[in-house]
Every structure is written in structure tokens, then in C-alpha cells.
From Swiss-Prot:
HAMAP family: IHF_beta. This protein is one of the two subunits of integration host factor, a specific DNA-binding protein that functions in genetic recombination as well as in transcriptional and translational control. It comes from Pseudomonas fluorescens (strain SBW25). InterPro entries: Hist_DNA-bd (IPR000119), Histone-like_DNA-bd_CS (IPR020816), IHF-like_DNA-bd_dom_sf (IPR010992), IHF_beta (IPR005685). Coiled coil: none annotated. The keyword DNA-binding applies. One of its GO terms (biological process) is regulation of DNA-templated transcription. This is Integration host factor subunit beta. Belongs to the bacterial histone-like protein family.
Length: 98
């Protein structure tokens, strides 16, 4: 699902807000979450999951075109850990054949 598809679904299922209002709310939420992670903070949405940063150590990679070894710097990457309710719901839907 893309961001625009999410906006359409929310507007369709809930008739009180306009498409522009929903779009602004989602963009604002995503921007705040991005800023939070950029400063090293953790985000927890109970029942859904948590977002945090994981450190990837420096390593030697390989250029897929040339096969040449390339040194890669260490970096932080966003990580999502689903909450119990989300895991249960996904598995419940899977068991029903969805």
C-alpha cells in the first residue's frame, strides 16, 4: 500500500475529514516520526510496534558489477519490531486464508 492509497482508504472509511486533511495528518505524522528517529529516539505505538535505530558495523562489501571489494562505513538503519497485537492479527488473518 502506498501513502496515497492509505489516504484514500482512510477518507473512504471515515467521512468526516477531507482528503487534504488526512493527507496533511499523515505527512505530519511521518515527518515527526522521521525527526524522532533522526535524533536517535525510539518510537513505540502500543499494539502496533516500535521503531528504533540499529547500528550496522563497517564491513567490506562487493561491487556487483565489477566484483571489486568496497569498504563500507558503519551506519544507523531504521528498524521496526511489530507488537504482539499486530503479530497476532497477521497470523490470525493468515490462518483464515487472507
Amino acid at each position: 500500500m502506498t501513502k496515497s492509497e492509505l489516504i484514500e482508504r482512510i477518507v473512504t472509511h471515515q467521512g468526516l475529514l477531507s482528503s487534504k486533511d488526512v493527507e496533511l495528518a499523515i505527512k505530519t505524522m511521518l515527518e515527526q516520526m522521521s525527526q524522532c528517529l533522526a535524533t536517535g529516539d525510539r518510537i513505540e505505538i502500543r499494539g502496533f510496534g516500535s521503531f528504533s535505530l540499529h547500528y550496522r558495523a563497517p564491513r567490506v562489501g562487493r561491487n556487483p558489477k565489477t566484483g571489486q571489494s568496497v569498504s563500507l562505513d558503519g551506519k544507523f538503519v531504521p528498524h521496526f519490531k511489530p507488537g504482539k497485537e499486530l503479530r497476532d492479527r497477521v497470523n490470525e488473518d493468515e490462518e483464515e486464508g487472507v
